[in-house]
UniProtKB/Swiss-Prot annotation:
Pfam families reported in the protein's UniProt record: UPF0154
Lineage, top ranks: Bacteria, Bacillati, Bacillota, Bacilli, Bacillales
Subcellular location: Cell membrane
Protein name per UniProt: UPF0154 protein Exig_1099
InterPro entries: UPF0154
Region named Disordered: 54-76
Assigned protein family: Belongs to the UPF0154 family.
Keyword annotations of the record: Cell membrane, Membrane, Transmembrane, Transmembrane helix
Length: 76
C-alpha cells in the first residue's frame, strides 16, 4: 500500500482514540460526581444540626472557607 494510506489510517486511529478517551473520561467523571456530590452549604448545615449545633451563617462560611483552603493546600 501507499505511504499516504498508512499515514491516513494512523491519523484516523489517533482521532478515534482521543474521542473515545474523552468520552470515557467524561462518563467516568459524571458517574463519580453523581455518586459523590461535592459538599455545599446545605450539607454543612444538616451536618451541624445532626451534631447538635445551631448552624449560623458565620459558622457555615467558616467551615466552607476551611474546606476550600484545605483542598488548595499542597499535600506533603
Amino acid at each position: 500500500m501507499a505511504t499516504w494510506i498508512w499515514i491516513l489510517i494512523a491519523l484516523l486511529c489517533l482521532v478515534a482514540g482521543v474521542a473515545l478517551g474523552f468520552y470515557i473520561a467524561r462518563r467516568y467523571m459524571m458517574n463519580y460526581l453523581e455518586q459523590n456530590p461535592p459538599i455545599n452549604e446545605d450539607m454543612i448545615k444538616t451536618l451541624m444540626m445532626q451534631m447538635g449545633q445551631k448552624p449560623s451563617q458565620k459558622k457555615v462560611n467558616q467551615v466552607m472557607r476551611s474546606m476550600s483552603g484545605s483542598m488548595k493546600s499542597p499535600k506533603k
